[in-house]
Amino acid sequence: MRRQVTESKRKLGRVDAVALHWPLLLDAPASEDDARSVRADAWRELEAMVDEGLVGCLGLSNFDVELMDEIIALARHPPVLNEVEMSPRCYQAELLAACEARGVRVVGYSPYGTC
């Protein structure tokens, strides 16, 4: 991650936000504890980038309430956004309310052609 963020900052001059995308692993971990550990390690690396001034703030992408709370519980720099599918056909009211209650802004997306 660091190499990509550093390269983006070099090209753009600044990186306002980076989102930890997709909380599940493509290669199945040995256990849920392993998956939790991978997410925590990734978040800590992102927080180090904030500390170093590489990134302005952090967010999540496709995290449900349980997994969002997992990150919030360990975060020194809590997520400011959660990018999730949100459309008239996929209105996630519970997730939206949970994000609002935690001060996390929802960035909605809709796969092309689903509306």
Regions found by a protein language model. Name each.
Residues M1-L20, A48-E52:
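CE4/NodB-like, metal-dependent polysaccharide N-deacetylase domain
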Residues W22-C115:
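Beta/alpha (TIM)-barrel catalytic core signal, keyed to glycine-rich beta->alpha loops juxtaposed to Asp/Glu
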